[in-house]
């Protein structure tokens, strides 16, 4: 769990997201409270429940970006889902409990990767020995060959016994090891045997009630797995593949599952987007709105705290933090079920973005669009320079189109930038060595006619 203070979390989010200070403060406090809770006594820790958050704001103002950056900061199991992907129990589609199952899968992946890092050096040593056995095989005594037999799925069981290497063989092996570590053998092609990961065709399996935690695809994959497959690869690639396989053997999966479930239960974060799309609008409760209300009712126990069956065991959602968000343009937060409103006690409204924010978005973040496009053109040996006047003109046009057409917030900058640099991107390979300056005149020449025509801008920008 992250040990950042709320001020440090906000500062980190400021590197990528402009404005929206109230939303940043809310998620920063929530994240810090997870850290505080971990340091309480066991009895008190059980009583401290997360204060779930509802972020309200139009599209393109930073709700999803805040969630994405928070995931990297949290160093905790994190999943982003759309409420519209789920259906009420009894309808065809995914049920809301699959949110927790997916979160557990994220936790398993995270803990497994951490465990592999810890055994990396040991795995590399074992992979190196396997490579040396392939590059410089020792002669077999032949003893035990008669006892070899084929197993249930056709793989040979039993192997020849290797003799003790002679002094000369040991010396040759050390020379080969030195060449291997120096990278002199990286381009040589060899055949290696890897455990085959059987791919089961993707299919949607509707399981009976009570069997949701059983993954039939994993069961089928397990039945067909276990074989080895010979691949011809270069030594450098072989080292990576063998290291990965050896690391997998060294990791204790039972421990991984226990740690992952504990981490999900105590530190898991779910970002639930598009919650407004499952609201019954106003007084309408007919047709599809019945199913929408059903999704909300299914979410209630999950957000409040329940036990979900997964293939790794039972998982409690009592202390999972839920951050919900929605534009709420057609529906209002008050259209949510009262019980669900009560389980989202912290409300944060995000402001719409205007010209001033667009100028900052184009210049201040570390991953600003202007820097991204300059880097892309730099690959073609073109120096792309944006002047302050050019950025002002870009922000002005994006704001104007948002006002006259659909307001999609900062996402409008992507469409404007693509149209602005369309000709340059196409002809870049033929213009290597040039210096292209994007000033107000360049922007107006490329975009002003389109932005001025309201009907045309709806389709192009």
UniProtKB/Swiss-Prot annotation:
Q: Which GO terms describe its biological process?
A: protein unfolding; proteolysis involved in protein catabolic process
UniProt keywords (A-Z) are:
ATP-binding, Chaperone, Cytoplasm, Nucleotide-binding, Stress response
Query: Which InterPro entries does this entry report, sorted A to Z?
Result: AAA+_ATPase, ATP-dep_Clp_protease_ClpX, ATPase_AAA_core, Clp_ATPase_C, HslU, P-loop_NTPase
Any Pfam family = AAA
GO MF, one term, reads: proteasome-activating activity
Q: Where does ATP bind?
A: 18, 60-65, 273, 339, 411
CC annotations in GO = HslUV protease complex
Positions of region (Disordered): 157-178
* Subcellular localization, as worded in the UniProt entry: Cytoplasm
Q: What is this protein called?
A: ATP-dependent protease ATPase subunit HslU
Which organism encodes this protein?
A: Magnetococcus marinus (strain ATCC BAA-1437 / JCM 17883 / MC-1)
């Amino acid at each position: 769990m992250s040990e950042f203070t709320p001020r440090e979390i906000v500062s980190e989010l400021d590197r990528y997201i402009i404005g929206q200070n109230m939303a940043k403060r809310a998620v920063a406090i929530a994240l810090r409270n997870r850290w505080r809770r971990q340091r309480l006594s066991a009895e008190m820790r059980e009583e401290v429940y997360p204060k779930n958050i509802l972020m309200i704001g139009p599209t393109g103002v930073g709700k999803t970006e805040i969630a994405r950056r928070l995931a990297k900061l949290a160093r905790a199991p994190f999943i982003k889902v759309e409420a519209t992907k789920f259906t009420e129990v009894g309808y065809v589609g995914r049920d809301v409990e699959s949110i927790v199952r997916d979160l557990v899968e994220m936790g398993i992946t995270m803990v497994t990767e951490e465990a592999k890092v810890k055994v990396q050096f040991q795995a590399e040593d074992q992979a190196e020995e396997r490579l040396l056995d392939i590059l410089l095989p020792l002669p077999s005594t032949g003893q035990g060959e008669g006892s070899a037999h084929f197993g249930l799925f056709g793989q040979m069981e039993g192997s020849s016994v290797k003799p003790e290497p002679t002094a000369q063989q040991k010396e040759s092996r050390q020379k080969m090891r030195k060449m291997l570590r120096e990278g002199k053998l990286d381009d040589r092609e060899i055949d290696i045997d890897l455990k085959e990961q059987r791919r089961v065709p993707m299919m949607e399996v509707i399981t009976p009630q009570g069997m949701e935690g059983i993954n039939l695809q994993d069961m089928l994959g397990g039945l067909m797995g276990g074989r080895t497959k010979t691949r011809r690869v270069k030594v450098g690639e072989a080292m990576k593949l063998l290291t990965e396989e050896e690391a997998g053997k060294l990791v204790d999966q039972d421990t991984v599952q226990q740690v992952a479930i504990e981490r999900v239960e105590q530190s898991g974060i779910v970002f639930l987007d598009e919650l407004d799309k499952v609201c019954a609008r106003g007084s309408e409760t007919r047709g599809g709105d019945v199913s929408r209300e059903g999704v909300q009712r299914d979410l209630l126990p999950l957000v409040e705290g329940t036990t979900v069956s997964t293939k790794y065991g039972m998982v409690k959602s009592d202390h999972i933090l839920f951050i919900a968000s929605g534009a709420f343009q057609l529906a209002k937060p008050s259209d949510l079920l009262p019980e669900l409103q009560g389980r989202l006690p912290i409300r944060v409204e995000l402001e719409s973005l205007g010209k001033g924010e667009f100028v900052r978005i184009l210049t201040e973040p570390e991953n600003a669009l202007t820097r991204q496009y300059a880097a892309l053109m730099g690959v073609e040996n073109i120096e792309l320079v944006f002047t302050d006047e050019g950025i002002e003109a870009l922000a002005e046009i994006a704001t104007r189109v948002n006002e006259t057409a659909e307001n999609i917030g900062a996402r409008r900058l992507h469409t404007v930038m693509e149209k602005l640099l369309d000709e340059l991107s196409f002809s870049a390979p033929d213009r290597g060595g040039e210096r292209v300056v994007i000033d107000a005149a360049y922007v107006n020449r490329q975009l002003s006619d389109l932005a001025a025509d309201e009907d045309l801008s709806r389709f192009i920008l």
